[in-house]
Amino acid sequence: MSEEISLSAEFIDRVKASVKPHWGKLGWVTYKRTYARWLPEKGRSENWDETVKRVVEGNINLDPRLQDSPSLELKQSLTEEAERLYKLIYGLGATPSGRNLWISGTDYQRRTGDSLNNCWFVAIRPQKYGDSKIVPSYLGKQEKAVSMPFSFLFDELMKGGGVGFSVARSNISQIPRVDFAIDLQLVVDETSESYDASVKVGAVGKNELVQDADSIYYRLPDTREGWVLANALLIDLHFAQTNPDRKQKLILDLSDIRPYGAEIHGFGGTASGPMPLISMLLDVNEVLNNKAGGRLTAVDAADICNLIGKAVVAGNVRRSAELALGSNDDQDFISMKQDQEKLMHHRWASNNSVAVDSAFSGYQPIAAGIRENGEPGIVNLDLSKNYGRIVDGYQAGIDGDVEGTNPCGEISLANGEPCNLFEVFPLIAEEQGWDLQEVFALAARYAKRVTFSPYDWEISREIIQKNRRIGISMSGIQDWLLTRLGNRVVTGFKDDFDPETHEAIKVPVYDKRAIKMVDQLYKAVVKADQDYSKTLGCNESIKHTTVKPSGTVAKLAGASEGMHFHYGAYLIQRIRFQDSDPLLPALKACGYRTEADIYTENTTCVEFPIKAVGADNPNFASAGTVSIAEQFATQAFLQTYWSDNAVSCTITFQDSEGDQVESLLRQYRFITKSTSLLPYFGGSLQQAPKEPIDKETYEKRSQEITGNVEEVFSQLNSDVKDLELVDQTDCEGGACPIK
């Protein structure tokens, strides 16, 4: 018989009385609008103590030993661990991923096995559905179908996850010839609330339905699975292997899909109506019909994935994260975003990267693209497959199933595998009296329990049980090292030569104290995983550590994001709110400057003055002042001594540094597993999200703020259910989902 661990009200009251959450300037506001779930019985959204209780209980009860009449000793031990986790997270010395903050401990988590993982990877090639929650009725479970990876991507995006996908030549070449062009008819009942809007985007009334012997009719249920299955059927009808009857007309009936604005239970939010799905299905069919008698290219497959992502964004999930990974010599793929019409229509939906190995040398066209628009990014699959931390040396096939990454690039992943993240703010945790080795051990155990979720897809269950991959990240890295060391980790550069090309290079010199600090913490994570894996009788995690880009979660604690340098020593951070957002009156009452958003109607832009941790330190550097060379070197430091997965980093560069991109990509080809770059804009845009300011302006603007937003909001009692978020970003490069 299974039993559940719960935290007592008395314990929580003691923590609230003794621990003060380390809210950043944007922290509580970011939390309230992003992670606080609605409590219908109380007519308000959660408070922070309630969120942390839900999250910790949702996680601790994943320990599989609780499923079989646990002993009192075990229950006591896990309760004590839950209490330590609660205290740690409540104080913001560490947090699980934003996905866990939103979903852990909910009914949606219990129903949906995939719900706790942020991001996934899938290879775009014919695959079997297997013993999964979604299997088209016309397929056997072991039958390979072209639709399967697109179904996986569509399903995970609608659950709020991000998906990396590979359209590398080795995958696309496995897709058979497109045998048929399909006549697609989308129908909606004339009595549907969505009828007029649906007809405008290409549907027809049900009275116009003409069915014959050559047609297939499918009435979509009003479910996520229904959307996925409709797209799967459309794709598979184009291929003789999955259309043996050679049917060439498909009628999809969307009459049952709930109208725009209707409530969505589970993940939350409101429905979009059938219109985004109608547009998507027509567009996907056009891509496939255009290749009838021929083969799909990497660009075609990426287009289908982007069209799916676009539909998901227009639907309930307001941000859809995709990373398209292509072959490094596929010029059509590399240049696909140069088609401005298609870029504006759907190709914006993914960040694009190319797969390389350490022998690759063709960086010139890649560097040119990066200077132009920040793409493509680089993913070194050879390093990912054969190395953990670089300092630990070559380990042939240590992660041999790797084929790609999640959208932010910090976790190398096999087909169907998710990332599984937990984030520690080492400076904050130390300031709150924590032993960092205990903190990182708690983090490892938290992430390990997530691997025992009942996953919906067979490919995911199998690879998770094999790899048990976790990704323990640290954030506020620049804050921590600058405060503890008094300087940045890169203390200088020395002259050297590339061992293969013999080019002159500048090799970074690292502070040896920093090497020791991160090495000890890495070993603490590995030891905790080894011990817990032995206790649970499961495989040790194939890899353990990472640096996630962070963003929304880092804002909670007011820390620098992942390994990134603060955007400026002093900033105006602009956050956009719907005009109806209940936080706006509280923000205005506290003196924050607001103005109408110039880009979006019914939206207000709120300005928050921010001072970076360590801004007054003479060795402080911001993204606007740190060199491109030091950023590459810092990423290499973390890949060498901390992360056995990868290090997510968006390196920013000034116009004057653009000519260094190619040589630095080449210099670090034996160290960097993934990287991306963007030109530094410095707040030159109107109402820029981040605008560097000077100290005097910061102090003046700070004096205008006279109240505590949390207290004023509570006094106004103006909470609202299911408010749509606008303008949320969860990482430096914009690749992560909102939650």
UniProtKB/Swiss-Prot annotation:
What cofactor requirement does the entry state? adenosylcob(III)alamin
| Reaction catalysed by this enzyme | a 2'-deoxyribonucleoside 5'-triphosphate + [thioredoxin]-disulfide + H2O = a ribonucleoside 5'-triphosphate + [thioredoxin]-dithiol
Start and end residues of each stretch annotated as Effector region-2: 168-313
Q: Which GO terms describe its biological process?
A: DNA replication
A Pfam family this chain is assigned to: RNR-II_ins_dom
**EC category:** oxidoreductase
Known EC number:
1.17.4.2
Sorted alphabetically, the keyword list is: Allosteric enzyme, Cobalamin, Cobalt, Disulfide bond, DNA replication, Oxidoreductase, Redox-active center
Q: Where is this region: Adenosylcobalamin-binding-2?
A: 685-724
Q: Which SUPFAM superfamilies match?
A: PFL-like glycyl radical enzymes
Q: Does the keyword Disulfide bond apply?
A: yes
| Cysteine-cysteine disulfides | 119-419
State the residue spans of region: Effector region-1: 147-158
Subunit structure comment from the entry: Monomer.
Supply the name of the protein: Adenosylcobalamin-dependent ribonucleoside-triphosphate reductase
Q: Write the gene name.
A: rtpR
